[in-house]
Amino acid sequence: SWQALWGHPELLDRTLGWYETVEPVAREIARRQGFDGVRWMKMTDPSGTEAPSNVGSFLIWQQPHFIYLAELVYRANPSDEVIKKYNHLVQETAKFMYSFATYDDFHGRFILKGAIPAQETLRAATTINPPFELSYWHYAMNVAQQWRERAGEKRNLEWDEMIDKLSPLAYNEDSLYLAAENAVDTYKDIRFTSDHMAVLGSVGILPMNKLIRAD
């Protein structure tokens, strides 16, 4: 994203063609796993083939990247040309994000589970609602809806429901946000504080949102 942020959006625009090239691979990954849309890979070769890893295939924090990057290009050149060029993949990216989220009937909310968070120290089988991923989901789904409106399409009401009911970030009795909702020992277990600063990224990299307490 540095290209657009440092005044060279044309360089970023040139790189986004890779996503079109590997779309069939990403679509097949999503289909094989029972999801809609396209699931973007974390570690790949130039053709989109996933690199061997017991972590990479469980990561989801890279999924919203395309929406974020396309939005940077649009901000630099807010035109119908950009919308026509990238809206298809923006929507396909969001389709996966919606289908990946699980509705928690008991609490009346959407949750993110079955993923390894960005700091890569938590287990996919037990992790619920990692904070950076929640914030990124909230941001990117909102942007995807804006792209629908820019393209003259109606907002997806199911997506709006997910945005409205996405789980807030979990915190402990000291009002400190957790590495995941289930990671109650975040500030006692070095596994949770020895890698990527995912909690800070939730509102440091991403804008403030309603999942985070204003106080």
Where are each of the predicted segments found?
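Glycine- and aromatic-rich loop/turn segments at beta-sheet edges
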Residues: 27-41, 99-116, 173-184
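Active-site core of glycosidic bond-cleaving carbohydrate-active enzymes
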Residues: 1-28, 32, 55, 59-76, ...
